[in-house]
């Protein structure tokens, strides 16, 4: 048996939650000790640099990248429009990668793990191989994100465009999910959504594995922070809510309170009115353990929030929303707020009590250790591979 791992962007550097999820999958696939080839697209936003991949990873598998121009264009949109396909997916079609897949040796059983629906354009050529079985790993139900965008915008042109993109994407998602040999959703929420689409393909939830962390957060700290890539609209909206609606109210009661905002694709800005923009943080573990209370008023999106899981693994006290906690099983140590007023109140309770910060943080940490163990996740993957 051999493995072919396809990604729509380089795994390294791990600049966002998607890369983090792919890094975890790559490490799991290598842990199976099955010979592995890794094909990745390189885009304008996510260029390829071989040296960003750790040396031990490069030594354990064959890595090849293919340049893709994915920045949306009017010409590209109308070409896709008249061809009747999804522009969201068509942008990731590269002839060189298709040829490489077509020529990939299939003289022995081959498992292909495809990251996200954005690589669905390669399914037809993959299915021509007699010995290949395709597993699609779903990070989100992508068409649902575009429906949410359509519902959120007040611009009638954007509403029409987003609805059109969602409908085209939904058709191709259903087709791809139906043609795959197996689906690997990250969460039970997405697994249920796939079933509701009428998909009969076997679906096995493969959560994001997290290494156990021995250290815990510093519970003497009661300042606030948010971390997330700022090229993702739900994170942009959450930061705006924090800065404009939640933090100013808290600042009245706690004049010396600070809010740190961190994440890739954001600029550093000096402390102003208690808010500091840190940009990308190189030592995530240290940042999580030393920054206080994670506040994440996420109001849109689907799939699991990788940064929340990472913070939970470090025992960080967290306040978020039902959408922010989507995909994470219940009784997880997260504090869920239902309104902006409730969000502010829950933060107030944590600011006031070190014991509460410790109790909720340690509950979250224990939850992650129980449900997201790499050994448990690896066992599930190997079992599913053996079935094919």
Where are the regions that the model predicts?
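Short hydrophobic beta-strand element within catalytic cores of glycosyltransferases
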Residues: 307-310, 317-320
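Acidic donor-binding loop of glycosyltransferase active sites
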Residues: 181, 286-303, 314-317
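Conserved acidic donor-binding segment of nucleotide-sugar-dependent glycosyltransferases
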Residues: 334-341, 348-355
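Donor nucleotide-sugar binding/catalytic pocket of nucleotide-sugar-dependent glycosyltransferases
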Residues: 162-166, 170-214
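A charged, aromatic-enriched C-terminal amphipathic alpha-helix characteristic of glycosyltransferases
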Residues: 352-385
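N-terminal subdomain of nucleotide-sugar transferases
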Residues: 1-61, 107, 249
